[in-house]
Amino acid sequence: QETCGTMVRALMPCLPFVQGKEKEPSKGCCSGAKRLDGETKTGPQRVHACECIQTAMKTYSDIDGKLVSEVPKHCGIVDSKLPPIDVNMDCKTVGVVPRQPQLPVSLRHGPVTGPSDPAHKARLERPQIRVPPPAPEKA
């Protein structure tokens, strides 16, 4: 696990952007952000990185939190492991990756038809099981 100092040094080139002094993050900023994103795969790593970034944000009071959250987008980091970080947020919450919601069984296997659906009505009108007529009785 990287130390806070190493993480913050990797992100130092981002300072002019997150302070609003530059319109785009530099290549050095994006390089550091991509490296940090690649090293925050587990919950504890994300919590540690969040706490380090928060400490840096408190040290440099002129950092714009909105610009911090834009770094991944500007640097082409898709599906960043770290959520936008705010100085006041509880970093322990970034250690939990939300589970993807499960679809109801009915949606996993196609649409469910209801009484007003013509397909449903057609199924009701034709019998599902065909029973042959009884054989004529012999007299």
From Swiss-Prot:
It holds the Pfam family Tryp_alpha_amyl. Disulfide bonds join 14-29, 30-75, 50-91. One of its GO terms (biological process) is lipid transport. The keyword Transport applies. The keyword Disulfide bond applies. Residues 118-128 have a biased composition (Basic and acidic residues). Keywords: Allergen, Disulfide bond, Lipid-binding, Transport. Residues 130-139 have a biased composition (Pro residues). GO terms for molecular function: lipid binding. PROSITE patterns: PLANT_LTP (PS00597). Residues 102-139 are annotated as: Disordered. Belongs to the plant LTP family. PANTHER family: NON-SPECIFIC LIPID-TRANSFER PROTEIN 2-RELATED. Plant non-specific lipid-transfer proteins transfer phospholipids as well as galactolipids across membranes. May play a role in wax or cutin deposition in the cell walls of expanding epidermal cells and certain secretory tissues. This is Probable non-specific lipid-transfer protein. The lineage of its organism: Eukaryota, Viridiplantae, Streptophyta, Embryophyta, Tracheophyta.
